[in-house]
C-alpha cells in the first residue's frame, strides 16, 4: 500500500492555484499590511501555503537576479520560507507578516506565478514532487 505524501505534487498545482486566485486578487487589492493579514486569515491552510509558495518563488527569483539589494532581512526571509511547508493553522498569521508587509508584493506574486506556469508546462523543478 502506497502512502500519499502530505506535500503537493506537480499534478496538484493547477487546482491549488485555481483555488488561490480569489485570495491572490484580494491580496493585490489590499492597501494595508493589516488587510493583507486579514485576507490570509480568512483562507484555508492550502490556500495560504499556495500563496506563500508563489511569493517565495517570486522573491527567490528576484533575489537571484539581484534586482533587490542583499540585506539583513533576506536571512530572515530564507528561514521563514524554509518553514512554509510545515506551517500550522495556529501560525497562519505569524511569520507571514514579514512578507505581507513588503511593498513589492505584486512583483513577488507575478514572478512566482510565471515560474510555476513555466514549471508546469516544461517539467521544471519548482513544483515539488515529494519531500
Segments and roles (model prediction):
Residues 38-48:
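Structural motif
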Residues 3-10, 17-24, 29-33, 37, ...:
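General marker for long, soluble alpha-helical cores
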Residues 38, 60-63, 100, 117:
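Beta-sandwich interaction modules
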Residues 53-54, 66, 124-125:
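Short coil/turn segments at secondary-structure boundaries
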Residues 36-40, 53, 97:
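Amphipathic alpha-helical segments within well-ordered protein domains
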Residues 49-59:
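Short, hydrophobic/amphipathic alpha-helical patches that form generic packing surfaces
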Residues 79-131:
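Helix-rich interaction surfaces within compact, conserved domain-sized segments
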